[in-house]
């Protein structure tokens, strides 16, 4: 589900679920977390996360196991691992980053964004509240007012 390459001190992780627009499921969350841990253990100096195809990450795979017990824990653990990584993690956002895909970019230290990229947190449109981590992280990055606009407009 992921491809890992290394060029010198740079490890690149490519999400490879192009048929699902790189949507996250439990297995992908575990693989990303393990890739971060391995890059750190192998003395990488930086990690880049990107998506194969035209999408960075379409969010949680709603046709998969995201409703199963344990998915949200796997997602939270992956995000925490990225945030706490002692090396810079760069999200190379090559296309849409929706829902959990936006969370993946928020967990990263830097975001390099292609002109075709867009971000969305559609939870409000679905009648679902946004988790506290996402609200705090987005507000810390772009400010409270703009973050409220994103959440209230479900953009």
Where are the model-predicted features located?
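Crotonase-fold acyl-CoA enzyme core
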Residues: 83-155
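A general structural signal for well-ordered alpha-helical segments in protein cores
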Residues: 8, 29, 75, 135, ...
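Short, small-residue-rich loop/turn micro-motifs
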Residues: 8, 51-53, 60, 115, ...
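Glycine- (often His-adjacent) and acidic-residue-rich active-site loop
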Residues: 51-84, 97, 127
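Conserved CoA-thioester-binding segment of acyl-CoA-metabolizing enzymes
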Residues: 1-52
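Hydrophobic alpha-helical membrane-association signature
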Residues: 28-31, 71-74, 104
């Amino acid at each position: 589900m992921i491809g890992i390459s290394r060029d010198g001190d740079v490890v690149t992780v490519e999400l490879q679920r192009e048929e699902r627009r790189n949507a996250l499921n439990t297995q992908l969350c575990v693989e990303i977390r393990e890739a971060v841990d391995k890059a750190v253990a192998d003395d990488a100096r930086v990690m880049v996360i990107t998506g194969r195809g035209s999408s960075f990450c379409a969010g949680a795979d709603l046709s998969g196991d995201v409703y199963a017990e344990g998915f949200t824990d796997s997602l939270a653990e992956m995000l925490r691992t990225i945030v706490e990584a002692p090396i810079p993690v760069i999200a190379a956002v090559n296309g849409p980053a929706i829902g959990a895909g936006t969370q993946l970019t928020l967990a990263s230290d830097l975001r390099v964004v292609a002109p075709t990229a867009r971000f969305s947190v559609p939870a409000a449109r679905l009648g679902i509240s946004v988790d506290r981590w996402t609200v705090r992280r987005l507000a810390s990055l772009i400010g409270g007012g703009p973050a409220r606009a994103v959440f209230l407009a479900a953009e």
